[in-house]
Amino acid sequence: MKTFKFLLVAVSAVLLMGCSKTPQQETKADDDKNVVIETIMTRRSVRKYQPQAVNRDTMQTIVECGINAPNAINRQAWEVRIVDNPEVIQKLTDLYLKDNPKEAENPNFKNMFRNAPTVAFIANDTTFAYSPVDCGLMAENMILSAWSMGIGSCCLGGPARFMKSNPEANKYLLEMGFSENYDLLLCIGFGYPAETPKAKPRDAAKVKFMD
């Protein structure tokens, strides 16, 4: 009887070992079904959108994901303004076309925000050195959360530079009411995608593990 019990325990142990996964196997299995990794790896910058603005409830979720990004000493040194008024976007675009008339010849050009119907304007605190980094982390959270809900996006620096340098466009920037010492750093265009861009190659050689 003792021998039988010993054999039973031994067989059970072998079966359990056979059913258990190695750390490598667990990692591979988790990666295959990890929605975060899937979102990161499938996200693409979108430049063609359907005309309707992103639902404000959806944008609220996107912004909440943004402000939950990691940031230096929890200063939350960012401010965000969301614009989905087509008239405002068109007026800014008209000003942009005055300075860049050749853009009007592009049949795919609809507005200066890469054709997006909803735009997030993100400003950084110029008195805090880490604020631009924090704004970048916030922007990435917004972009990824948007993609996970079927919302395309494109991160933009050009419109921010234009709005700060063009006196007429700067009036719209002032109307956004950013706090003192806050400077428009970047914009993100959001919208329902009307294209499915292909992935572009990435240079993995730029990453090296150090011994």
Model-derived features: positions:
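Bacterial N-terminal signal peptides that target proteins for export
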Residues: 1-8
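Bacterial N-terminal signal peptides
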Residues: 8-15
